[in-house]
């Protein structure tokens, strides 16, 4: 099993799809990585040679992925909360941040409904 960026890449999938199992790499970035490594997008990971997998590793290392990206994301949210700006307050109260309506909807952000006790 090929290991790239600390993640076991599924070998039975095509290179384009297999790279998307890494957090921070979607289809577009996966396509760019395959192009830079001169690897056909439809070639399976199990068919690749060790040198080609090493090229993939080098290309993936150029991007912020996995733990570093998650840490960066949480620190950005924490920074907004510490600044007490509007977006930080919305994050703190678990409400939609980008101006969506909250009279109805916004259930994903707010969580399940709270029962009204009489």
Swiss-Prot record:
Pfam family, one: Ribosomal_S13
SUBUNIT field: Part of the 30S ribosomal subunit. Forms a loose heterodimer with protein S19. Forms two bridges to the 50S subunit in the 70S ribosome.
PANTHER family (alphabetical): 30S RIBOSOMAL PROTEIN S13/40S RIBOSOMAL PROTEIN S18 (PTHR10871), SMALL RIBOSOMAL SUBUNIT PROTEIN US13M (PTHR10871:SF1)
The UniProt record lists the keyword Ribosomal protein: yes
GO biological-process terms attached to the record: translation
Function: Located at the top of the head of the 30S subunit, it contacts several helices of the 16S rRNA. In the 70S ribosome it contacts the 23S rRNA (bridge B1a) and protein L5 of the 50S subunit (bridge B1b), connecting the 2 subunits; these bridges are implicated in subunit movement. Contacts the tRNAs in the A and P-sites.
Span list, region Disordered: 97-118
InterPro entries cross-referenced by the UniProt entry: Rbsml_uS13_C, Ribosomal_uS13, Ribosomal_uS13-like_H2TH, Ribosomal_uS13_bac-type, Ribosomal_uS13_CS
A molecular function GO annotation: rRNA binding
GO CC terms: cytosol; small ribosomal subunit
Native organism: Buchnera aphidicola subsp. Schizaphis graminum (strain Sg)
This protein's name: Small ribosomal subunit protein uS13
Keyword Membrane assigned: no
NCBIfam families for the chain: uS13_bact
Family membership noted in the UniProt record: Belongs to the universal ribosomal protein uS13 family.
Assigned keywords, A-Z: Ribonucleoprotein, Ribosomal protein, RNA-binding, rRNA-binding, tRNA-binding
């Amino acid at each position: 099993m090929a290991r790239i960026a600390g993640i076991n890449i599924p070998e039975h999938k095509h290179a384009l799809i297999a790279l998307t199992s890494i957090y921070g790499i979607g289809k577009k970035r996966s396509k760019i990585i395959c192009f830079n490594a001169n690897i056909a997008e439809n070639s399976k990971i199990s068919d690749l040679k060790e040198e080609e997998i090493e090229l993939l590793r080098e290309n993936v290392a150029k991007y912020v992925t996995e733990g570093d990206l998650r840490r960066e994301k949480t620190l950005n949210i924490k920074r907004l909360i510490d600044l007490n700006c509007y977006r930080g307050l919305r994050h703190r109260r678990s409400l939609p941040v980008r101006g969506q309506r909250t009279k109805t909807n916004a259930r994903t952000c707010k969580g399940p409904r709270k029962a009204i006790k009489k």
